[in-house]
């Protein structure tokens, strides 16, 4: 078991979430095999965080989000030989979006998703490779 990590303070985790230039964010629907890298913007309101992002997903993932809006986002930031991993559990909502550009398949399209985290946990790993702690692989 790899114990070479430190827990991130909440303010550091939020700072990392807001710095989207250095991070890779992955969206997973509860019980879904899909892990989709996404581009996102963060917005703080009333002390809470809300992420709005556009992602290319197929119809099946969109349907899963609409039927069960419990989602997990995992943000990974690699910096100075350390890996910060922030796991956010919360709810997703697909927003109306005029963009219907096809991406990987004809059935795929870009959708705008609003993610509201309910629980945020973060860890910073040292030089050793971290164990796979992705919320996608529960």
What function would you assign to each model-found segment?
Residues 20-57, 63, 74:
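Short beta-strand segments
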Residues 18-19, 32-34, 85, 106:
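Short solvent-exposed loop/turn micro-motifs enriched in small/polar/acidic residues
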Residues 17-21, 67-70:
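A short, compositionally biased
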Residues 122-138:
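Mixed-charge, glycine-accented linear interaction segment located at domain edges/termini
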Residues 1-19:
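Extreme N-terminal tail/first-helix region
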Residues 45-48, 56-119:
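Short, structured beta-strand-loop surface elements
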Residues 7, 27-29, 75-81:
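A short, aromatic/hydrophobic, helix- or strand-capping loop or linear motif
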């Amino acid at each position: 078991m790899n114990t070479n990590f430190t827990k991130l303070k909440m303010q550091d985790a939020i700072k990392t979430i807001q710095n989207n230039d250095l991070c890779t964010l992955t969206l997973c629907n509860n019980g879904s095999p899909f892990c989709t890298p996404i581009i996102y913007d963060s917005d703080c309101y009333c002390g809470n965080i809300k992420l709005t992002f556009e992602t290319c997903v197929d119809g099946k993932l969109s349907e899963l989000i609409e039927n069960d809006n419990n989602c997990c986002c995992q943000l990974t930031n690699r910096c100075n030989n350390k890996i910060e991993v922030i796991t956010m559990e919360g709810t997703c909502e697909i927003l109306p979006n005029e963009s219907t550009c096809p991406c990987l398949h004809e059935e795929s399209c870009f959708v705008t998703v609003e993610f509201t985290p309910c629980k945020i946990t973060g860890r910073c790993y040292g030089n050793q490779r971290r164990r796979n702690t992705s919320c996608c692989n529960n």
